Every structure is written in structure tokens, then in C-alpha cells.
């Protein structure tokens, strides 16, 4: 039995990860930002602690984290969210050297290359991997060689075109991402976004159908793919482009091949999660970003028969992750995040017309991100957490704008 520490332990993906790690016989501890959350309330965690928020109180979290490691012994640390993955990648070398604890995250140099949206697009462009036209936007303080900011923006837009998306290079989810339809609108909105989020890129706007794809991969040390899952996300919230609340597992060899090539060029080791859009007009697929940690839709992989939890253990604590036999892969699995799906139902004009019906709660191929009959509290706590968030007018405005 190994002792495993999960960071961002309040996250919904902790529910299924803890369940599967528990089945494998490991002792699980989580650091959580709040108690009213899906992750904190799952019955599959053995120990849980409320910690400072790694994003909002970075220094306080760092102090808490190292004090916690002094008092507890672990064999493996797995980050379960964007901010904790970023934090752990920076601290990986120190943690592994000083505390002899393996960190299931890439080294910071590789992590940053994948996490930086502009740098990732440069890799895709260089190696002819499917992606939208993207160019770095200049510093808003640009003065070099007498160049005017407007002229540089104009040259960028000549390649990218309109409509386009201003995308911060480093941000979680859709934070800071803004659609613009003209050079004038870009000039107006870009400085404010850059001041808030730092370096940005301008990316071709992809008019997508009413779905997008998510690709999960685990790449071994020897470069071979241990396991993969592709899901077609058909309901998401917010409606303008958000997190999956209903998806279906599918087979898509082309997407797997493209994402594998991307990880190869990054010299990636471990788990990675890709968001991929399909151009509604051309049908072409485009990699948008990599999330270098397990996503909220992780339950879909387990529903498909792919055990990423075992891959983590075998790769980091054993003799290497086994290669999954795709003959055992299950397409057509339906996975819901009930708490978020309720928000979709309240806001979507398709609430009664969507197929399969929103009211199809049970079935042999239906499972939930946020719990089950055997572990119901994450669904209750997660739904309550969502209600509390949307009572905040600032949060509500940020999520529902556009």
C-alpha cells in the first residue's frame, strides 16, 4: 500500500480518481480549499485537510504545503487542478530531492511549454499538427524602432484574420479569452486583457458545431502511449463554451495520432489532456490547448474501461504503465456532471429537445463525474457549491457574459 497526496482535492475529478486508487488499496490524503465540494465529501478519501488556496494565496499555500510534508510521509503526489499542477511542477525538483516523494507532473520547463498557449501553437505549427492560426500579440508598451502598436497588431491580424480570439498565454479555463471582430475592437480590448493576464496571443476563431472533443493520454517514459480516451462533449456550461456536463466516449484514431505527435515533440511524460475543436465550415479539427493535469471529465475514461489511476501507480511507483488493449475500449458511454448539468438545463433553450433526453438519469452506459448511489455526497455538496458560486454576482457575470 502506498500513501498518495492529492492536491486541489476539492475538484470533481478527485471523486473517480480516489475511488479507483482506493480499489487498488492505497491510502489517500487530499488538500482541499473548501469542505463544501465534491472532492472533499467523497467517501474514498482517508484523510483530508483544508489548505490555503494555491491560486489566491500562493505563498501561504507553499508554506502550508511544506509544513504538511514535514509532518506526513507520502510516496506520490498527484495534482488534480491547473493551479496545483503549475505549483508542483515548479517545486518538483525540491520535493523529490529533499523529501524523496515522487511528483506526478512534468518538470517546469516542459510543463511551461505545454501550458503556454502561444508556445504550444508554435510547436503545432512547426511540426504540422492540427491547430488554428495563432500569433503572439506584442507588448502593450511596444516602442521598438518607432513601431506603433497599431501597425504590429495589423500585421498579426493579416495572418490570423477575423473573427479572432484574444487568449492569455497563461490562464486557467476560459479566463481572459475574448472574441474580437475587427482591428478597432482588438485595439480597444487587448490592452485591458494584457494588463490583467500578461502576454497574449491572437488566435483564429473556430466556429464550432454544438460539440467539441477532449482527448486524454498517458505517455510512458519510453514514449509509448499507455492509454487514451476520446470524448465528444455535447453539453457544456456556460453555454458559450464551457466545461463538459454531458459527453460520450468515442473512437477517433486521427485525433489520438495528432495528440501523440504533439506529446512526442514536447518530450512529454505522464498524463495530458487536450481540447480539440472542429471547424463547422470545413470539418477540420484543431488542437486548442493542453491541460497538463487530469480533467474534470476523467470519469469518462473509467467508463470506457481505461484505468488512468492504475497507469499513474504503475508508471511512477512500479515498473511502468501497462499498454491498454484498445479492443477493450467502450464507445458510447454517457457521462454526466449532474450539478453542472442542472445549470445547463436552466439556461439552455434545448432543455426539452436535446437527444438523448436530459431526463435519462439511469442506464447501463450512464455514469456521473460527481458521484454515484454508492458515494452520493459529492453530488450534493458539488451542487450546493455551484449554487453558492452563482449567488456571487461577479462570478455570475464572468461566467454568463457573451
Where is each model-derived feature located?
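Protein kinase-like catalytic core scaffold
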Residues: 164, 225-226, 284-289
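A short glycine-rich, hydrophobically flanked beta-strand micro-motif that places a catalytic Asp/Glu
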Residues: 269-281
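Active-site nucleotide/adenylate-binding loops and adjacent lid/helix of ATP-dependent enzymes
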Residues: 111-209, 221-223, 253-257
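ATP-binding N-terminal substructure of ATP-dependent carboxylate-amine bond-forming enzymes
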Residues: 1-104, 141-151, 380-396
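ATP-dependent carboxylate/phosphate-activation module, predominantly the ATP-grasp catalytic core
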Residues: 184, 193, 204-267, 291-316
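Short glycine-enriched loops at secondary-structure junctions
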Residues: 32-37, 82-84, 221-225, 231-233, ...
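Peripheral (often C-terminal) accessory segments that flank ATP-dependent C-N-forming ligase machineries
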Residues: 314-402
